UniProtKB/Swiss-Prot annotation:
GO terms for cellular component: cytoplasm; small ribosomal subunit. Coiled coil: none annotated. InterPro entries: Ribosomal_uS19 (IPR002222), Ribosomal_uS19_bac-type (IPR005732), Ribosomal_uS19_CS (IPR020934), Ribosomal_uS19_SF (IPR023575). Protein S19 forms a complex with S13 that binds strongly to the 16S ribosomal RNA. Keywords: Ribonucleoprotein, Ribosomal protein, RNA-binding, rRNA-binding. One of its GO terms (biological process) is ribosomal small subunit assembly. This is Small ribosomal subunit protein uS19. GO terms for molecular function: rRNA binding; structural constituent of ribosome. The gene is rpsS. The keyword RNA-binding applies.
């Protein structure tokens, strides 16, 4: 058995407390704001909306069952891809 299977998943304590508190208050549907991109998604988070910080703003992500055992940071991209710059058409005509 590999070492990684022996160890449990990593979740920051403050995020774990917020998830437990939100599970108690089912009527409270506000997203949980977090800066912890390194935390692993565990089954108690399913159905919650978590706002993950991407370096500039908090990106709201609805947690589904397919996301379990992934990291929160995977769902809040930090870089924006604007595409390659198109060549100047006037320069090509000359």
């Amino acid at each position: 058995m590999p070492r990684s299977l022996k160890k449990s998943f990593f979740v920051d304590r403050h995020l774990l407390k917020k998830v437990e508190k939100s599970a108690e208050n089912n009527k409270d549907k506000k997203p949980i704001r977090t800066w912890s991109r390194r935390s692993t998604i565990f089954p108690e988070m399913i159905g919650l909306t978590i706002a993950i910080h991407n370096g500039r703003l908090h990106v709201p992500v609805f947690i589904s069952d397919e996301m379990v055992s992934h990291k929160l940071g995977e769902f809040a991209p930090t870089r924006t891809y604007r595409g390659h710059v198109a060549a100047d058409r006037k320069a090509k005509k000359r």
